[in-house]
Structure formats: structure tokens, C-alpha cells
Amino acid sequence: MSNIEKQVGELQEKLIAVNRVSKTVKGGRIMSFTALTVVGDGNGRVGFGYGKAREVPAAIQKAMEKARRNMINVALNEGTLQHPVKGVHTGSRVFMQPASEGTGIIAGGAMRAVLEVAGVRNVLSKAYGSTNPINVVRATIDALANMKSPEMVAAKRGKTVDEILG
């Protein structure tokens, strides 16, 4: 499991995993490679991509392109989360909660990469169930997408932010 990082313009790109896969055909096995990447602007935008090709660089390039096309906005609160959130994808479950300044990113493997490129600086998190990188990344992005800022909740309920926060 490698973790390569690049800066392109204002986007941070991270390579989470490269995997060799094979397809068995009559004449033998056809080898190819898959790559899982995440990109983010470090300020609340994050996306992931999964690419597959006969060569590693081509797989990584495809994954990066897909990640750039597949970005979501995340409502951050001064470098941490708005509230505790849960995310699920197939067998992976993730739980993340806001942390005070100076805590850092307490997260493992694939989840850490997603949180870093999203711009989260302080968070406590835990992955339960399957720790397959693809499923963990999807669950993490699901959790971040489900996070709502007080402004979003207030607008939805037709109230002011002060009424929501108490």
C-alpha cells in the first residue's frame, strides 16, 4: 500500500492503493492494474477515483481524472467536522467526530488520505468492519457528504442559526 502525494494547481492528489489483478482466459491470465486515488483542494472539496489499465501509470492517470470529475463539497468548521458523523459502504462502517485544535488527524490508512486532502486538520475517527481501501474511502466520503452545517439545517427548517444552536 503506497501513499504518493502531488500538488497540481490548487488540488492535492494522493495515491492510496495500487493493485495487480488478473483475468483468466482460455490462453492464460491477462494481468492489469487498478489504482485508487483521492484529490482535494484542502478547503472542503474532495473526490475519489478508481482506475484500471494494463500499466500502472495509465491506471493512476485514469483514477486521477475520475477523482477530479467526482468531487463533492464538505462543510467544514475551522478545520474540523460540524458534528459526529457515520458513513457506510458495503461492509465498511466509519465513525468520525470533531476534535479540538491541536489533536491532528486520528485516522488510519485510506481514511487519513481522504481527510487530509479534504482540509480536515483535527478529527477523531474509527473504521469498523471491512478495511478494504475502496470501501473505506467510499464510506468516508459518504459520511462527509452527509455532514450538515448549522446554516444548512437552519435553511431547511426555516429558522435562524441562533434558534438551531440554542
From Swiss-Prot:
It holds the Pfam family Ribosomal_S5_C. One of its GO terms (biological process) is translation. Keywords: Ribonucleoprotein, Ribosomal protein, RNA-binding, rRNA-binding. Gene3D superfamilies: 3.30.160.20, 3.30.230.10. Disulfide bonds: none annotated. Residues 11-74 form the S5 DRBM domain. GO terms for molecular function: rRNA binding; structural constituent of ribosome. One of its GO terms (cellular component) is cytosolic small ribosomal subunit. PROSITE patterns: RIBOSOMAL_S5, S5_DSRBD. InterPro entries: Ribosomal_Su5_D2-typ_SF, Ribosomal_uS5, Ribosomal_uS5_bac-type, Ribosomal_uS5_C, Ribosomal_uS5_N, Ribosomal_uS5_N_CS, Ribsml_uS5_D2-typ_fold_subgr. The N-terminal domain interacts with the head of the 30S subunit; the C-terminal domain interacts with the body and contacts protein S4. The interaction surface between S4 and S5 is involved in control of translational fidelity. Part of the 30S ribosomal subunit. Contacts proteins S4 and S8. Belongs to the universal ribosomal protein uS5 family. With S4 and S12 plays an important role in translational accuracy. Located at the back of the 30S subunit body where it stabilizes the conformation of the head with respect to the body. This is Small ribosomal subunit protein uS5. It comes from Haemophilus influenzae (strain ATCC 51907 / DSM 11121 / KW20 / Rd). The lineage of its organism: Bacteria, Pseudomonadati, Pseudomonadota, Gammaproteobacteria, Pasteurellales.
